[in-house]
Amino acid sequence: MKKKKFMFFVQGEGRGHLTQAIAMQDILMQEGHEISAVVIGMSPRREIPAYVYQRFICPIHRLDSPNFVTDKHNKGIKVGASILSVVANAGKFNKSIRLMHEWIGEIDPDVILNFFDPLVGLYYLTHNCKVPHICVAHQYIYHHEDFQFPRGKFSDRFALKWFTGLTGSGAVKRLAISFYGMSPSKNNKIKIVPPLLRKELFNIKASEKDFYLVYLVNNGYIADVLSWHQQHPDKVIHCFTDKNQLPSIGDVSENFHVHQLDDKKFLELMAEAKALVTTAGFESVCEAMYLQKPVLMVPVQGHFEQYCNARDAFYAGAGIYSDAFHLQNIVEFASGSTADNSSFRDWVNSSQDCIYNELKSVLQ
């Protein structure tokens, strides 16, 4: 493939899509391509982690983008309030789309890669953009006809598939990142690919020390983890979460340590932890599986996507799931866990070639 100029758009909730974008940057630069700009769509309640500025070697822009509204404790998702927020902020999002149009015109990329930001789908629906658009996210697996949704929850399933389809509007290809391989989809735009994980993971050596690692996409859940810890003060906890609106970062007690998001430190501690406890995202679970660390997944309340992720990861052998932060479950599970994730590691190790070949197939 001839040298191309790429422009990234990334949904900035949590760290998963940002981590995937960083990993994709490394793959493309290794092949001699250029990343001209990264645009991160976020809500005002989020901060772009410092490590993101350190890892991208191009200009970074921030846009207001639709995201979920949480409850007053910053835990669960309020679906109705989230929809009303989109309507109430329509003017703000229209401004974001105008900025996107200006930046795309100025940068003149050969390719746009969208890591699940809905504004990109809206942009392609409302503008006659000729730049090829490829989207990359775990969520596109929901459009594969063989994906097994949890039973029931048909309205949630419809809404999730609709929103996922919106983010991919106008895309020439949708790379569906998966815990496992699947047969080719009848929709030739959907391609199942292995997890897109950062290169540092492959050079780290796993060990086991006497502590548990926690990652919370919504920092309101820290009270739940702390409540469990107060009943088990002998257990050592290292907890990472968004520092925005968090009253303190540091040592809560002798054995409870809170960290702001730091990709290097997080990975180092994961390699040494007994297990990972996390809201049921995708990226951190994959990293833990690769390092053969058992996982307790607790879906964010009202977040159907995470509800699906937890069950999908369970069937893939990641660990266990729960509707609350009952860390005793993972303490007991980890003590008897002898999981062999060698097939998952082989799948992940094929990621770079698989993903780059999919890009080449439409960009030659």
What are these regions (language model features)?
Residues 10-22:
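A short, glycine/small-residue-rich beta-strand->loop->alpha-helix junction that serves as a flexible
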Residues 75-111, 118-119:
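Conserved nucleotide-sugar donor-binding subdomain of glycosyltransferases
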Residues 112-115, 268-308:
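A donor-sugar binding/catalytic signature common to diverse glycosyltransferases
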Residues 166-173, 180, 317-364:
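Leloir-type glycosyltransferase catalytic cores
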Residues 52, 101-111, 121-134:
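Glycosyltransferases and closely related glycan-assembly transferases
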Residues 196-272:
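Donor-nucleotide binding loops and adjacent catalytic segments primarily
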Residues 127, 131-192:
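Active-site-proximal region of nucleotide-activated glycan assembly enzymes
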